[in-house]
Amino acid sequence: MLEIDNLFVSYGQSEVLHGVGFSAARNETVAIMGRNGMGKTTLFKALVGMLPATRGSMRVDGVDVSGDESWRRVAKGIGYVPQGRQIFSTLTVEENIRTGLEHAASQRVPDDIYALFPVLFDMRKRRGGNLSGGQQQQLAIARALATDPKVLLLDEPTEGIQPSVVKDIARALNEIRKVREIAIVVSEQVLSFALDVADRLFVIEGGRFVHESTRDAGDAGRIREYLSV
C-alpha cells in the first residue's frame, strides 16, 4: 500500500534523512520511533509532500507520487494528521470534519467516523476550540479519515494527551485499520502506545533507521534503550 525506497531529504546543504526505506501493507500499522530531533517529523513532512526529497521514491497503492505536491498526494490516497492537533478552532466539530470532504461528491460526514469517535457526534455542534486536547486529536484524525485515505500518517498523535485518552486513540486506530482496511503509519515516542497499535516498529536515529522489529519479537527493551539515550 505504501512503499518508500531510499529517501533522502536535505535542509539547504545539510542532509537530514539518509536513504530511509520502509513499507506498510493494507491493514497494517507501522510505528516510527525515535527521540526528538532524530528525523520523525522531517520524514512525515517529506511523505506528505511538504518537504521535497532530493532522492528516492514513494508509491501509494502502486502509484508513484514522488514528484507530486501535497494536495495531489491527498487525492491519491494520503491522509495526514500533523503534530500539534491542528484544527479550525472557530468551526464546529462537524464543519471541521467537512473540510476533509471539500472535493467529495457528498458533504455528509460518513457514519463510520462518528461510530469510531462517539464523543465527536455528541459534540458535533461545539466549536473545535472548546474541545479538550484529546478530543481535538480525535477530531484531527476524523477529518483526515473523511478524505477516505488508503494510507493514514499520524505524527506523534499522543503528544500532550492524558493516558486515558491515549488508550481511546489506540482503540480507534485499531478499529480504523480493521474497518477501513488501510495502512497506518505513526511516529511516536511512547512505546506502550506503539506496542498497542503497531505490527512493526522502526527506530530512527540521526536520519537513519537503526532498528526494526515486529511487535511480537520481544524487542521492547532494546527499543526503550534507543528512546532513552
Q: Which role fits each region the language model picked out?
A:
Residues 52, 64-85, 110, 122-126, ...:
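ABC ATPase NBD coupling module
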Residues 146-150:
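A short, proline-enriched helix->beta-strand linker immediately N-terminal to the Walker B motif
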